[in-house]
Amino acid sequence: MLPTLTALLCLGLCLSQRINTEKETLPKPIIWAKPSIMVTNGNSVNIWCQGAQSASEYQLYFEGSFFALERPKPSRSMNKVRFFISQMTSHTAGIYTCFYQSGELWSKSSNPLKLVVTGLYDTPNLWVYPRPEVTLGENVTFFCQLKTATSKFFLLKERGSNHIQNKYGNIQAEFPMGPVTRAHRGTYRCFGSYNDYAWSFPSEPVTLLITGGVENSSLAPTDPTSSLDYWEFDLSTNESGLQKDSAFWDHTTQNLIRIGLACIILITLVWLLTEDWLSKRKDHEEANRLTNWECRRRWRMQHYFEEEQRNAISMMELKATPGAL
């Protein structure tokens, strides 16, 4: 019993230490870019990193390597810092992450921030077939063409989704859509690029107009790649959309783990105590049974000896009486 309780206590201490160790990693910060993550070549951009109020240092990493360090200045917004990139080029376009330090602890990495530089190549041409104004349910195709051969084209809907559609191509790419709904209407631009983060100048805008009667909710795109939900490159830049309090979920998870661990240990202890009580009760009943048997055995032995003694006395009395025999 004692070794089992000792083992359970050690298990609880080890798991508690494991939870405390995991807790010693601070929640991940929030990262975003202003004015946008799409920056014209040569223009400046600000990268913001926001962590805990007690953060003393922030580090910015570019493509997995250390890039810059900033310390928060005494102000009302001590929980965030600004990293300034004076001139955006193809060498500064890519994936950024940030960390912060509070005391002796470091946070987890932020979500990746993808910075895109534009204006590096020729300006592509964009047009839509069969025409810019179509009726509900028609199929349309956007064509993006660049004089200089490239490897990938991107189609972006302005002030619409935070994602863009991409296609591989040499000097031209096609972006089929349809059957179109009112969600497809809007202004589009396209870009050419040699990688995901270095793009050409934007094309001239092309506005897609959707006309017709009441929209049929059963209309669905025939090409799986033409759906407005089909995107491969995330361009989320909204600061408020990135503000997610992961600390709440971290603490909730840790508390649930602790409660679960406590319940497991409590149930195990109750089971062990019940087993111990049943074992002792069984031993006690066995001892009582043996005691009763021993008492009966002794009583029979005593009765036997007393009977033998009476018989011996009777025989002696008979022998002592003259003429008894």
UniProtKB/Swiss-Prot annotation:
Coarsely, its chief localization is: membrane
Signal peptide range: 1-16
Which chain regions cross the lipid bilayer?
Answer: 256-273
Q: Cytoplasmic compartment: which residues?
A: 274-325
Extracellular membrane side: 17-255
Q: Which InterPro entries match?
A: Ig-like_dom_sf (IPR036179), Ig-like_fold (IPR013783), Ig-like_Receptors_ImmuneReg (IPR050412), Ig_sub (IPR003599), Immunoglobulin_dom (IPR013151)
Q: In which tissues is it expressed?
A: Selectively expressed by NK cells.
State whether keyword Cell membrane applies.
Answer: yes
Q: Where is the Ig-like domain?
A: 34-118, 129-211
UniProt record similarity statement:
Belongs to the natural cytotoxicity receptor (NCR) family.
Q: What is this protein called?
A: Natural cytotoxicity triggering receptor 1
What gene is behind this protein? Ncr1
